[in-house]
Every structure is written in C-alpha cells, then in structure tokens.
Amino acid sequence: MSAKRAELKKTHLSKNYKAVCLELKPEPTKTFDYKAVKQEGRFTKAGVTQDLKNELREVREELKEKMEEIKQIKDLMDKDFDKLHEFVEIMKEMQKDMDEKMDILINTQKNYKLPLRRAPKEQQELRLMGKTHREPQLRPKKMDGASGVNGAPCALHKKTMAPQKTKQGSLDPLHHCGTCCEKCLLCALKNNYNRGNIPSEASGLYKGGEEPVTTQPSVGHAVPAPKSQTEGR
C-alpha cells in the first residue's frame, strides 16, 4: 500500500484529494456464509456416498449372480453325486450277485469232486455186484487134456454141471441143457454116449446154428480124440 501511495503522490500531485481518497479506498472483502458452505459440503458428501452406494449395488448384483452360478453348480454336483451313489449301489448289488454265483460254482465243484474221489469205491462195489451177477453165468475154462475147439464147450459144461450137483445131489443119466448151452458140443456127445450113439470126428464141429450130427460107432463106445491132440502126439 505504501508503494502505491508513493507512486500516486508522485503522479497525481495535481489531483483532488477526494479523487485520491476514492482511489485509495480499500477493496471490499468477500464474505461467505458458513451455512452455505456447509450445504455445499453436504452436497459434495452426498454425491460421494451416492457413487459409493451405486458401486455397492453393482457389487451386490455381481455377488448375487455369482451366488446363483454357485447354486447351479451345486445342484449339478448334487445330481452327479446322486448318480454316483446310485451307480455305487448298483455295483454293490452286482458284487453280491457275483459272490453268490461264485459260492454256487464252488459248491458245485466240491459236489463234482466228491463223486470222483468216491469213484474207486463205487467201482469196487460195481465189480463185486458184477461178480455176484456173473457167478451163475458161464465162464469158459480150459479142460485138462483138451484144447482147441472142444476146450471151451467142456469148460462151459463143467460150469453148468457144478451147481446141478450141489442142488440135486445126483446126476440124471441124460443131461438136459438149458438155453445157455443148446449148442453145447460136450452135452451132445454125452447124451449120444448115454444113449449108445457115438458120433464120428466130423460131428465134433458144427457150423452156424446147425445141430451136431451123430452116427453109429463102428467099434466100441469110446469118444475119439480131437485132431489137434492126435497131431501133437
């Protein structure tokens, strides 16, 4: 201010005092109402809070969307878990069925192996039963002093005559053969011998279902020896 006044004195010496006073009048100061300033501050604060609220709303909306996505994923996971649980139950049932089938197979194998182990005993029993059934039947054996074709009929004759001796005690003069020895050569020879008919050597052999032919002997009542014995001698 002093500098300005000095300059004014130098430059405006000729001017009026009033004009100088008017020029040197202090500038009016600006005054602000506190209430107005306070209201302006309120407006600025309200704008900031509004922005914050908007941001919060956006964040909430995003969170809601994320939560919905999470719920959807959870529902899918629950469905998948239910499917997995059903699959596990199905697998358990299949395992039970397989265990039951394996038990059945093991039992069948055991039952199948037991008869195989008992097979020798059963075979022995069957052999014994076969022996008992074969006892009344005829078994061919070689006779002492006979061989060839006449050997088998003689053995058959012995077998057929043995039980008759035990049962009847004495033999009939004429031997009656059953169906088992209808074509028994020895029986035919013995019957012919008892009746007085001695067959020839040709009658010792018979073919097919023909009966042996008997002829009257020329000399004595003796049974001729077979050809095999005569040749061996």
Swiss-Prot record:
Keywords: Coiled coil. GO terms for cellular component: microtubule cytoskeleton; nucleus. Residues 45-111 form a coiled coil. This is Testis-expressed protein 35. The keyword Isomerase does not apply. Residues 199-233 are annotated as: Disordered. Testis-specific. It holds the Pfam family Tsc35.
